[in-house]
């Protein structure tokens, strides 16, 4: 359905997955894929609905947390900053915590809240694995705010 570019077919396929097989990993994966397709075809409301469903209904926490991260990013793109921060307010597993902190930093940076952004990016720096390539991006964001990411290492939460 995604490859065909037929939005109606995609919506029907996604609805069928969530209606018939809501507790399966396939339903969550189809919601994530549908959301990506909706975003690529400039249908942000449909993307938000798919991500909201996955964040609340996914049978596995990994898919639910990934959906929350993507939903918060989409909300931030739409300048719904308070809504995005609320989406990120529920705790994340350690595997996702650094990414969630990074998204929070992006939201604060977009609002010109430098101190809050620095704290969030510093949290992300500490939470991400030391060998994670993503840390380089977080380091660049901290540098842009005049901070040394190595200084974030020893700081407390």
Regions found by a protein language model. Name each.
Residues 19-27, 41, 55-64, 90-99, ...:
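Short solvent-exposed coil/turn linkers within tandem alpha-helical repeat scaffolds
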Residues 1-29:
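Short extracytoplasmic
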